[in-house]
Amino acid sequence: MAKVAQIRAIVEQLKRYDYHYYVLDDPLVSDFEYDQLYKQLQALEQAHPELIQPDSPTQRVGGIVVEAFNKFPHQNPMLSLDNAFDTATIASFIANINNLTGVQNRFVVEPKIDGVSISLTYENGLLTRALTRGDGLVGEDVLSNVKTIKSIPLTIPFHKQVEIRGEIFVDKKTFAQINENLAKPFANARNLAAGTLRNLNSEVSAKRKLKAFFYFVPNALTLGCRSQSAVLAQLKQWNFPVSKAVASFDRPEALIEYLEQFDQTRDQLNFQVDGLVVKLDNFHFYDQLGFTSKFPRWALAYKFKPKFVQTKLRGVLVTVGRTGKINYTAQLDPVNLEGTVVSAATLHNFDYIKEKDIRLNDTVIIYKAGEIIPKVLEVCLPLRTAANQPIPEQTHCPACQAPLVQYKDEVDQYCTNERCDQRNLEAINYFVSKTAMDIQGLSIQTISKLYENNLVRSVVDLYHLKEHKAAVLALELKIGEVLFNKLISSIEQSKTKGMARLLTGLGIKHVGQVLAKSLTKHFENIDALQSASMETLLELPDVGPTVAESLFNWFHNDNNLQLLAALKAVGVQMDALKSNTNFDTASIYFQKSFVITGSFPISRDTIKNLLVNKYDCRFTNNVTSKVDFVLAGIKATPRKLEQAKALNIPIINEPIWT
């Protein structure tokens, strides 16, 4: 008992030091004193491993390497916020809420950190899961990396399940230090944070000193918190890092003044922000205000006015996209813009270049449109010389040299050669992307290599790639047996993605992810959409004449119909997936946790999809006391079976997914 008490006391002391150092930025002891106490704890734990505490600072150390991150559905969807680009919109937002609720409300203003959103789950006081935002419905569990962030508590004094959300980021100073030592620097701090958080080796995360701020608790009423201010106070009490730049206001005029002042001083912060979030403080009115189809009505993001910087335009890169559209991109002298090193900016199309009279070697003003894509705003004409020559118009496709066309009422030029190699490559790359069929393991470089070697010349060829294993392994792609099998598994899994993702991946002009999902509400499958008349298409709420014509023409093109037939022949499902709210809740498998081991007649990914749709299950790679069932196939891992037996976890040997 004496050793337990000694270890517990050291853990609490180190946690206190960590909180003051990483959260309050107020060190209590020197690094030497901290290290000595840490080494004392390590020695005690090595001598008594059975006494290691789950919240011990030694449990944060990186070095865990995982093959992949497991995906899990969010308990509550992680929605985006609607944006306001001026203070008048914010004032209107506040007035509308006050009118609807009938009272003068308090509003909380929080910095919108330019980082990576994270959702932490604590069970019985212990941090058990850390999900990225993902698509808002499903995220990746990056717990092994999050545990290396020393400002995040591993335990909290609350013994029910609770979800806590925040933002993980890299501060400006750390970003500059890390980039100094990289052969290929990160373009911005957000990319560095995202890449670090998704690195499969947690040792990388431990070295990069990620930071975090927390600001939201879904279902906060279960904590007894009746306002956002109370949530932030509770988070501070639990030693979570909360931004000092949070403020609250009873008067709209004072809030607006704060927004304007913050915009002028934000560069003084040591972290990148891309706006401020204005939230209604009182939770009592949240249900009354509700949500739009995309956003909560009780919060709004105020986006800062774009900043402008000056640089030299050294050249123009002309490329062709999957639809044949020609893109003009300015090649710039590198310049820092809003925390990002920018060396390229969009010029849109040649009409834009002519309208702005942009020339080679001009000094130009660039800015970030919506804080995302750099654009060329204008030319600094007083700095122009006679040596600045006009940019020539592209008349032929830069990839296949086919003549370009410009359609009536459009400003863009197009390559109409359907056999253009670059167009086909971009089309395949888009088809496998996360927003479309989500086939993992295929970069544009890999696709290009497969294309050059006649292994993948169209999206249909992806589904025959398993027949060319030897040829793929022979290429210099750094793809071995294990990665090849994972790639094939991901390709096979994509067959079940359904109509919306397939429609997105086909790259039909004017049909993106949102419209594709909308079409599945009106047509039960691709065949029904293919049979739709122009009149039927024009009756749809999200379809105008241009989109209707594009859809109708695509589905009446012989080449496209042959493509659909070939995809159907290899087993790609073309029905609209219905969201399953009719789980088998009476089953013993409903919402249980599974480990899958061994081989089966169908892929593990397919099994997981079937079990999720039927029982709303969860999955993990390791057998622990938190696992409910082990699903064992042929040649199941003996160690996992032994662990299951030791923990009295049922082992299933039958196809429960059918």
Curated annotation (Swiss-Prot):
Q: Which cysteines are joined by disulfide bonds?
A: none
- Please list the residues that bind Zn(2+): C397, C400, C415, C420
Q: Does the keyword Methyltransferase apply?
A: no
What GO cellular-component annotations does this UniProt entry give?
cytosol
Molecular function, one GO term = DNA ligase (NAD+) activity
The UniProt record lists the keyword NAD? yes
> Which NCBIfam families does this UniProt record tie to the protein?
dnlj (TIGR00575), PRK07956.1 (NF005932)
Q: Which residues form the BRCT domain?
A: 584-654
Q: Where does NAD(+) bind?
A: D31, F32, E33, Y34, D35, S80, L81, E110, R133, E167, K279, K303
Q: Which UniProt keywords apply?
A: DNA damage, DNA repair, DNA replication, Ligase, Magnesium, Manganese, Metal-binding, NAD, Zinc
Q: Which Gene3D superfamilies match?
A: 5' to 3' exonuclease, C-terminal subdomain, 6.20.10.30, BRCT domain, DNA ligase/mRNA capping enzyme, Helix hairpin bin, Nucleic acid-binding proteins
Q: Explain the purpose of this protein.
A: DNA ligase that catalyzes the formation of phosphodiester linkages between 5'-phosphoryl and 3'-hydroxyl groups in double-stranded DNA using NAD as a coenzyme and as the energy source for the reaction. It is essential for DNA replication and repair of damaged DNA.
Q: Which Pfam families match?
A: BRCT, DNA_ligase_aden, DNA_ligase_OB, DNA_ligase_ZBD, HHH_2, Nlig-Ia
What protein name applies here? DNA ligase
Annotated membrane-spanning segments are none
Q: What is its cofactor? A: Mg(2+); Mn(2+)
Record's family? Answer: Belongs to the NAD-dependent DNA ligase family. LigA subfamily.
Enzyme class, first EC level, given as a word: ligase
Give the active-site positions. Answer: K112
Q: What is its EC number?
A: 6.5.1.2
Q: Name a biological process GO annotation.
A: DNA repair
- Look up the domain of life of the source: Bacteria
Q: Which SUPFAM superfamilies match?
A: BRCT domain (SSF52113), DNA ligase/mRNA capping enzyme, catalytic domain (SSF56091), Nucleic acid-binding proteins (SSF50249), RuvA domain 2-like (SSF47781)
